A protein has these predicted regions:
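Acidic low-complexity segments
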Residues: 90-92, 99, 112-190, 194-208
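Active-site neighborhood of thiol-dependent amide/isopeptide-bond enzymes
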Residues: 168, 172-176, 181-263, 285-288
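N-terminal secretory signal peptides
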Residues: 1-10, 14-24
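Intrinsically disordered, low-complexity N-terminal segments that are enriched in acidic
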Residues: 12-15, 30-125
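Active-site rim recognition segments
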Residues: 242, 246-370
Length: 370
């Protein structure tokens, strides 16, 4: 068998030349300005309307409502609702996730509800050159953000993978960055994945198929970070506005945001506090940013990759940080996360991604800026 020797220096030169050729941008793509910065607050009104088809006997619904309050970047300003059922707010005791629980009696053939929430949001950015003195995590909060969940364990293959990724990293910042780069390099956004994915990171790692959507890829980031001893958490929500930085893939196309759910993630770093991290959106840019299927060295991808470790745009509503959520009044299984409206009729959980039987719309409009 013939062997081939490769001169590493020549290979590097060839690779750089090829990369430069591929990366030559058009004038428009060369002038990318993706720089989220904390500034003016933007206020949005978000309306979720649900109508449950084929209602049989007792029917219930659970609608996530904003429960996140972070003084630097997000404020939940309250929710109101109308319904022909009986409604009350419910909380997940462990995570603080909040939902509107609505019940309809037997015989109500046309269950309907409408929830209106107001939120204020703004951009985030971390200056890694200027560490500060953020409040340390309380022991209970630190423990909860290092603990495994049903879909995000921190042992076994997750721990083994994390150990390999962070080998040689000396600080939490280095570990967090190494995991981010690994997820960006080794995963992909799979257009065939339903919804935002199910977040089963063990199945991903065991199969070797690291494709999925945000609830998969960012959950993988969180699991790997927690396994490395770095507190991390998912933040479940929905995009509510176009990107002001020209990314079609990172914003909405209209006021109808029914399918704009998006899970982001955060990692807690000494000197910086909770830091935004979103490797899944880097892979979304690769797959979906026009003209689609971009190369990793495309300027739009490079800008997203640079920015989304440490910053994100405030065109998005945060519902909660919850995992393993039991829906009050339901005998069905726990949810891995609560990001979509949920419903049951006659004791059967409806498919929240089935528009025929679990009909809902979500709309968003900006009501003030500044």
């Amino acid at each position: 068998m013939k062997t081939m020797s490769i001169d590493r220096r020549e290979l590097l030169k060839a690779g750089l030349a090829a990369s430069a050729a591929v990366a030559l941008p058009s004038a428009a793509r060369a002038d990318i300005h993706f720089e989220p910065r904390p500034g003016a607050w933007r206020t949005f009104e978000v309306v979720t309307r649900m109508e449950i088809g084929k209602a049989e006997r007792k029917t219930q619904a659970w609608i996530p409502v904003p429960a996140v309050n972070e003084p630097e970047w997000f404020r939940s300003l309250g929710s109101q609702w109308t319904t022909n059922g009986s409604a009350s707010l419910a909380h997940d005791a462990l995570s603080g996730a909040e939902m509107l629980h609505v019940e309809w009696p037997d015989g109500e053939r046309n269950p309907v509800l409408e929830v209106t929430s107001r939120i204020a949001t703004r951009d985030r950015a971390t200056d890694f050159a200027k560490p500060g003195r953020p409040a340390p995590l309380a022991a209970t909060e630190r423990e909860s953000n290092l603990r495994g969940t049903e879909l995000i364990p921190v042992d076994g293959i997750v721990k083994e993978t994390s150990d390999k990724i962070v080998a040689g990293a000396k600080t939490d910042v280095e570990k967090a960055r190494a995991i981010y780069e690994w997820v960006v390099d080794n995963t992909f956004r799979d257009a065939k994945t339903r919804g935002c994915g199910n977040g089963d990171i063990v199945a991903m790692l065991k199969s070797g198929n690291l494709g999925g959507k945000c609830a998969d890829l960012n959950a993988l980031y969180v699991g790997l970070a927690r396994s490395a001893g770095v507190p991390a958490r998912d933040v479940y929500g929905v995009r509510v506005a176009p990107s002001k930085f020209g990314y079609k893939s990172l914003g909405t196309g209209s006021q109808i945001v029914t399918k704009a759910q998006h899970c982001r993630s955060e990692v807690y770093l000494a000197g910086f506090g909770w830091v935004p991290v979103d490797p899944a959106d880097v892979r979304k840019v690769v797959l979906e940013e026009p003209p689609t299927n971009l190369a990793m060295n495309d300027p739009m991808v490079l800008a997203a990759r640079r920015v989304l470790f440490g910053a994100w745009e405030g065109n998005w509503l945060a519902y909660n940080f919850g995992h393993d959520i039991a829906l009050p009044g339901s005998n069905g299984p726990k949810l891995g996360f609560l990001m979509y409206p949920q419903a049951e009729t006659a004791g059967t959980r409806l498919d929240c991604l089935d528009p025929e039987n679990c009909r809902y719309t979500i709309s968003a409009k900006e009501i003030s800026a500044g």
